[in-house]
Amino acid sequence: MAGTIEVLVPGGEANPGPPLGPELGPTPVDVQAVVQEINDQTAAFDGTEVPVTVKYDDDGSFEIEVGVPPTAELIKDEAGFETGSGEPQEDFVADLSVDQVKQIAEQKHPDLLSYDLTNAAKEVVGTCTSLGVTIEGENPREFKERIDAGEYDDVFAAEAQA
């Protein structure tokens, strides 16, 4: 491959404008074809920021790799809010259920350093702490302590055996 471009684009809504267009302009690839391929591959993420890598050759051929959106984007999408709290320890902007935390952990697990779903869930809970999002109405730090105490082993262990 002659070059690689890494960008963050809204799923299914990439366009030839920034950030993609200026990066692709000087390359030999057909910008519109790249945009169409990215939109086809990211349609399921519907507006959520998705990391995309475009690898291209001098002959104009290209390959696209779509990553998993950042954890914060998945949480925002799942909980339905735009920006996190300015005071995340005091002012909470949304609430997630245990099932929503599990779903996000399952989506992110391949990209995380966690060796199992329980630890992936704890990473998601850590991001909830930074954003000001509660889980089951509880402060995320307290929720993490309950995970550590084994209260949710049955929820997160089922996936490990599957």
Curated annotation (Swiss-Prot):
Residues in the signal sequence: none
PROSITE patterns: RIBOSOMAL_L11
Residue span of region Disordered: 1-27
Gene Ontology CC terms, in alphabetical order: large ribosomal subunit
GO biological process, one term: translation
GO MF assignments: large ribosomal subunit rRNA binding; structural constituent of ribosome
Superkingdom in the source lineage: Archaea
The entry's keywords: Ribonucleoprotein, Ribosomal protein, RNA-binding, rRNA-binding
CDD domains per UniProt: Ribosomal_L11
Record InterPro entries: Ribosomal_uL11, Ribosomal_uL11_C, Ribosomal_uL11_C_sf, Ribosomal_uL11_CS, Ribosomal_uL11_N, Ribosomal_uL11_N_sf
Subunit note: Part of the 50S ribosomal subunit. Forms part of the ribosomal stalk which helps the ribosome interact with GTP-bound translation factors. Forms a heptameric L10(L12)2(L12)2(L12)2 complex, where L10 forms an elongated spine to which 3 L12 dimers bind in a sequential fashion.
HAMAP family: Ribosomal_uL11
Function: Forms part of the ribosomal stalk which helps the ribosome interact with GTP-bound translation factors.
UniProt record similarity statement: Belongs to the universal ribosomal protein uL11 family.
Record's protein name: Large ribosomal subunit protein uL11
Phylogenetic lineage: Archaea, Methanobacteriati, Methanobacteriota, Stenosarchaea group, Halobacteria
